[in-house]
C-alpha cells in the first residue's frame, strides 16, 4: 500500500514573504487537506456537544427538581390561604420563622447541586422566585437572598447558555466573547474552579483576536495540526502492523509440506496417521517456541490444542495478508469442479500469436474457431502477450499493440475475414518473452494459472515440448481432466544444424520424452517426421483456410471455361531462415543450374537470415528473385502454377496444403513430413536431386488436375477437426459427458505408470525452480516469473504476492 504524506492546507492568499519551502509543502490537493481538517474540526464540535449535552441534562434534572419544589410551595401557600385563619400582613416574627424553615431545607438543595455538578443552577432556580409571590401574602425575597448567600459561600460557578451556543454556531462569524457574555457579567469568579471552561474560554479569546491571515498562516504550525498529523501517522502505523502477518517459519512449512504430500507418502508406505503425528510434532515444536515469547499473541496461539485447525488458520492468515488466492495443493488438486450438463470447456494453449504468420499462431486459431462452431463445448484460446520491445522484434511491418484488447480485436478481424462466420470463443493472454537466439517465444511464469479452475476441463497444448521445457507451475494433468499435446515442430532437425548439434539433440530428445510423458495424457504428431514421443499417435489434425479452397474453386471454374488460370511459373514462400528449406533450395539450384537452364523462381519471405540467403544466391548466380513476404492468399500469388518446397525440417508444411487447395502443382521432397500429401495427384515428390529436376520440368510443362470434392474436404478444417476429435479421444470424453458420466480425476490408488509420471513431473518442477539450472540449459533470463511490464500490461498481481509462502 502506497502511503501519502498528510500535509495541512495553506491559504492561497499568503503574504509574499512566505518562503518557497513552505509553499512546496502545500502542494497536496486541497480536497484531501480540507477533508481531514473538517473531520478534525467536526470531532472537536462533537466532543463539545457531548459535554454540553451532559451539562444540559444535569441542569434540566435540577430544574425539574426546583419546579417540583416550587409547586409544593405554591400548594402550601394555597392551602394556607384556604385555611379558616385569616392571613394578614406578615410580621417580623413570621418572616423569621419562614426563613428558618427554608434554611432547614437548604442543605438538601446543596446536596442536589453537589451531586449533579450544575454550576450556579441554584442561583438560576432562586431567581425564578421573584417578589410576585408576595401577592399570595408572603414575601419570599428575603428567603431567596438568604439561600443565595448561603450557596455563594459554598461554591461559585458559571452557567453556559445552550440556546446562545446554538445561535452563535449558525451565525456567519462566531464571537466567543458573546458566547460567554453572561459569564462575564456575573463575574470571573464563577469559573474560578472550572478549569476546562476557563482554559477553553481563554483559547477562544486568543483565537478571536487574530486576523484571518494570521490564523491561516499559523495554522500549519499549530499544536492542533501537529497532533492531528501524529494521530493519522499512528492510524497508518496501526493499519500496517495489523496487516504485517509474520511468514510461515520452518516447522510450519514442513508441516504444510507433509500434509500436502500425504497421497505421495501413502504410495511409498507412510500411513496417514504417521503423517498426522509428524504434523502434530512440528506444531508442538512451534508451540514450545511461542511459550518462550512473553506476549499475549503467543498465549493466544497456543490456547488451541487442535494443531490441524491451528495450521490451517495460520496459512489462511498469511494468504489473506498477501492477497493470494489459493486454488489447491500440488498433490491434492485431483477432483475438478463440476461442469454444466452437456457443456465442456476446452482451453487451447499455443506458443505464438498473430500478426506473426507462423503455423503455431494460425492453426490453433482455426482450431479454436471450428471447435467452438460445434457448440458442444466452450473454447478459450490462450496466446502469448509480448511487451512492446519484443513485439517490434517479432511482428512484421513494425506492427505493435498497446493493450491485449487491441491485439484481440486484430486477431478476431483477421479470422472472420477468412472463415466467413463469427467464431464464439474467448481469447486470453499469458506473459511471454521472445528469445533472439532461439527465435521463439517462451512462457514467463505458470501458464496454467491464466485458466481459471472452473474452466480447467480439457487442455490442448500446441507444441507441448516447447511449452514445458522450462515450465514451472502446476502439473497440467492435475489441473485438467484431459490434456492433449499437438506436436508442430521438428526441433531435433533444427538443433542438429547448430554448433554441437548432435549432442544437443541427444539431450533435447530425452527432455521432450520427459515433459510430454509428465504433462500429457495424449500426444498427436502431425507427421512421422517428429520423434516418437510417449503416448503419441500420428495424425494430421490441420486444415487449410477456407479462403484457399474458394480460390481453388474459382481457378477450376476459369479452366472449365477455357480461360488461362495460371500465367506465372514457380514460386517458394516461407520465413527466410536457413532451417525453413532455403539451404536445400540453394544447394539444389546450384547443383543443377545447367539442367534447369532458364528456370526462374520467385522467393517470398522475410526473416533473420534474409541477407545471408540472398548473398549465397548471388554468389552462385542463381535465377532467384527475392520478394517481400506476403500472405499466401494474396492476389499476386494466385496465378502461379507450381509451388516448390524442398524443406525437410517441417513437420507438416501449411503452405504445401494451401498450394494444393488452390489447385497448384507442388514439388516437395519424399519425406515423412509430406506423407499426408502423397494421395493428391498434384503433389510431385522427389527422392534425389536429379529427380528434383525432372519433377520441376514435369510441373512446368503440364497442367494440374482439379480437386475432387473428397480431396477438398480432406484439406478442410471440418475434416481436420473430425480427425482431431477421434484421435485425441475427445469424442469419447464428450459423449461420456453427454451421457451423464463425466470423466473425473479421483483419489483412487494410481497405477505404477501414473506414479512414475508424477515423479517425473515433480522432479521437473524442482529442477526448473532453480534459476542457475535454467540459465545453464538455455532458458531465457527472468522467465521463471513474469516481470513488472507484464503486470502493467495484463493487470496482474506481482509474482511475490502470488507466491507468498515458498517456492523451489
Curated annotation (Swiss-Prot):
Stored Pfam families: Glycos_transf_1
Reaction(s) catalysed (UniProt annotation): a 1,2-diacyl-3-O-(beta-D-galactosyl)-sn-glycerol + UDP-alpha-D-galactose = a 1,2-diacyl-3-O-[alpha-D-galactosyl-(1->6)-beta-D-galactosyl]-sn-glycerol + UDP + H(+)
GO molecular function per UniProt: digalactosyldiacylglycerol synthase activity; glycosyltransferase activity; UDP-galactosyltransferase activity
Knockout consequences: Altered thylakoid membrane lipid composition and stunted phenotype; this phenotype is reversed by the dgs1-1 gain-of-function mutation.
Source superkingdom: Eukaryota
Transmembrane portions of the chain: none
Keywords attached to this entry: Chloroplast, Glycosyltransferase, Membrane, Plastid, Plastid outer membrane, Transferase, Transit peptide
Induction remark: 6-fold up-regulation by phosphate deficiency.
Main location: plastid
Key word Zinc-finger present: no
Region (Disordered): 1-23
GO cellular component, one term: mitochondrion
Regions of compositional bias (Low complexity) in chain numbering: 10-23
Enzyme Commission number(s) from the entry: 2.4.1.241
Transit peptide: 1-58
Cell location: Plastid, Chloroplast outer membrane
Function: Involved in the synthesis of diacylglycerol galactolipids that are specifically found in thylakoid membranes. Specific for alpha-glycosidic linkages. Responsible for the final assembly of galactolipids in photosynthetic membranes. Digalactosyldiacylglycerol (DGDG) provides stability to the photosystem I (PSI) complex, especially to the PsaA, PsaB, PsaC, PsaL and PsaH subunits.
Family listed: Belongs to the glycosyltransferase group 1 family. Glycosyltransferase 4 subfamily.
Protein name: Digalactosyldiacylglycerol synthase 1, chloroplastic
Source lineage: Eukaryota, Viridiplantae, Streptophyta, Embryophyta, Tracheophyta
Amino acid at each position: 500500500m502506497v502511503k501519502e504524506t498528510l500535509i495541512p492546507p495553506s491559504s492561497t492568499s499568503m503574504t509574499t514573504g512566505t518562503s518557497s519551502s513552505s509553499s512546496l509543502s502545500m502542494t497536496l490537493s486541497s480536497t484531501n487537506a480540507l477533508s481531514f481538517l473538517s473531520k478534525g474540526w467536526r470531532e472537536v464540535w462533537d466532543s463539545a456537544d457531548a459535554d454540553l449535552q451532559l451539562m444540559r441534562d444535569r441542569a434540566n434534572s435540577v430544574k425539574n427538581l426546583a419546579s417540583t419544589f416550587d409547586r409544593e410551595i405554591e400548594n402550601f401557600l394555597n392551602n394556607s390561604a384556604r385555611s379558616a385563619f385569616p392571613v394578614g400582613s406578615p410580621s417580623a416574627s413570621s418572616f423569621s420563622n419562614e426563613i428558618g424553615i427554608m434554611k432547614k431545607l437548604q442543605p438538601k438543595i446543596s446536596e442536589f447541586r453537589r451531586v449533579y455538578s450544575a454550576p450556579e443552577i441554584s442561583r438560576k432556580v432562586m431567581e425564578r422566585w421573584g417578589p410576585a409571590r408576595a401577592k399570595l401574602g408572603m414575601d419570599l425575597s428575603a428567603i431567596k437572598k438568604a439561600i443565595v448567600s448561603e450557596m455563594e459561600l459554598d461554591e461559585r460557578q458559571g452557567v453556559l447558555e445552550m440556546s446562545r451556543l446554538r445561535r452563535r454556531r449558525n451565525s456567519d462569524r462566531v464571537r466567543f466573547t458573546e458566547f460567554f457574555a453572561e459569564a462575564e457579567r456575573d463575574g470571573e469568579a464563577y469559573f474560578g474552579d472550572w478549569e476546562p471552561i476557563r482554559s477553553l474560554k481563554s483559547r477562544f479569546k486568543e483565537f478571536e483576536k487574530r486576523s484571518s491571515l494570521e490564523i491561516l498562516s499559523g495554522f500549519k504550525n499549530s499544536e492542533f495540526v501537529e497532533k492531528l498529523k501524529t494521530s493519522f501517522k499512528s492510524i497508518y502505523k496501526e493499519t500496517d502492523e495489523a496487516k504485517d502477518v509474520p511468514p510461515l517459519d520452518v516447522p510450519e512449512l514442513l508441516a504444510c509440506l507433509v500434509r500436502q504430500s500425504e497421497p505421495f507418502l501413502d504410495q511409498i508406505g507412510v500411513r496417514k496417521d504417521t503423517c498426522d503425528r509428524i504434523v502434530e510434532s512440528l506444531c508442538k515444536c512451534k508451540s514450545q517456541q511461542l511459550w518462550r515469547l512473553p506476549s499475549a499473541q503467543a498465549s493466544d496461539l497456543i490456547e488451541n490444542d487442535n494443531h490441524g485447525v491451528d495450521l490451517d488458520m495460520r496459512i489462511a492468515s498469511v494468504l489473506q495478508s498477501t492477497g493470494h488466492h489459493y486454488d489447491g495443493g500440488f498433490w491434492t488438486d485431483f477432483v475438478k469442479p463440476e461442469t454444466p450438463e452437456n457443456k465442456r470447456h476446452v482451453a487451447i494453449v499455443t506458443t505464438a500469436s498473430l500478426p506473426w504468420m507462423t503455423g503455431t499462431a494460425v492453426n490453433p486459431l482455426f482450431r479454436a474457431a471450428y471447435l467452438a462452431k460445434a457448440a458442444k463445448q466452450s473454447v478459450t484460446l490462450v496466446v502469448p502477450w509480448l511487451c512492446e520491445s519484443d513485439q517490434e522484434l517479432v511482428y512484421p511491418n513494425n506492427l505493435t499493440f498497446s493493450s491485449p484488447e487491441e491485439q484481440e480485436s486484430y486477431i478476431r478481424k483477421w479470422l472472420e475475414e477468412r472463415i466467413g462466420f463469427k467464431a464464439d470463443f474467448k481469447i486470453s493472454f499469458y506473459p511471454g518473452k521472445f528469445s533472439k537466439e532461439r527465435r521463439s517465444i517462451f512462457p514467463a511464469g505458470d501458464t496454467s494459472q491464466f485458466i481459471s479452475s472452473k474452466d480447467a476441463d480439457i487442455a490442448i497444448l500446441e507444441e507441448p515440448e516447447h511449452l514445458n521445457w522450462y515450465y514451472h507451475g502446476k502439473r497440467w494433468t492435475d489441473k485438467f481432466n484431459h490434456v492433449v499435446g499437438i506436436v508442430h515442430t521438428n526441433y531435433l532437425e533444427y538443433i542438429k544444424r547448430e554448433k554441437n548439434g548432435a549432442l544437443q539433440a541427444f539431450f533435447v530428445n530425452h527432455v521432450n520424452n520427459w515433459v510430454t510423458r509428465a504433462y500429457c495424457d495424449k500426444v498427436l504428431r502431425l507427421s512421422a517426421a517428429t520423434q516418437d514421443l510417449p503416448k503419441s499417435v500420428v495424425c494430421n489434425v490441420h486444415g487449410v483456410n477456407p479462403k484457399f479452397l474458394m480460390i481453388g474453386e474459382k481457378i477450376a471454374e476459369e479452366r472449365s471455361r477455357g480461360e488461362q488460370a495460371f500465367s506465372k511459373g514457380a514460386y517458394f514462400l516461407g520465413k527466410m531462415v536457413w532451417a525453413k528449406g532455403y539451404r536445400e533450395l540453394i544447394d539444389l539450384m546450384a547443383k543443377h543450374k545447367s539442367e534447369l537452364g532458364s528456370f526462374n523462381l520467385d522467393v517470398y519471405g522475410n526473416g533473420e537470415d534474409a541477407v545471408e540467403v540472398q548473398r549465397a544466391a548471388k554468389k552462385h548466380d542463381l535465377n532467384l528473385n527475392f520478394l517481400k513476404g506476403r500472405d499466401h492468399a494474396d492476389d499476386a500469388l494466385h496465378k502461379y502454377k507450381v509451388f516448390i518446397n524442398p524443406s525437410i525440417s517441417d513437420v507438416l508444411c501449411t503452405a504445401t496444403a494451401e498450394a494444393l487447395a488452390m489447385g497448384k502443382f507442388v514439388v516437395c521432397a519424399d519425406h515423412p513430413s509430406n506423407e499426408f500429401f502423397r494421395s493428391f495427384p498434384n503433389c510431385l515428390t522427389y527422392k534425389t536431386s536429379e529427380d528434383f529436376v525432372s519433377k520441376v520440368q514435369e510441373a512446368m510443362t503440364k497442367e494440374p488436375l482439379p480437386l475432387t470434392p473428397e480431396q477438398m474436404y480432406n484439406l478442410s478444417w471440418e475434416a481436420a477437426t473430425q480427425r482431431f476429435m477421434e484421435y485425441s479421444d475427445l469424442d469419447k470424453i464428450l459423449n461420456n459427458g453427454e451421457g451423464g458420466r463425466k470423466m473425473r480425476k479421483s483419489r483412487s490408488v494410481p497405477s505404477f505408470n501414473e506414479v512414475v509420471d508424477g515423479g517425473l513431473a515433480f522432479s521437473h518442477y524442482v529442477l526448473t525452480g532453480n534459476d542457475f539450472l535454467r540459465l545453464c540449459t538455455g532458458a531465457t533470463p527472468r522467465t521463471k516469473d513474469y516481470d513488472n511490464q507484464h503486470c502493467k500490461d495484463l493487470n496482474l498481481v506481482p509474482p511475490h504476492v502470488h507466491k507468498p509462502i515458498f517456492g523451489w
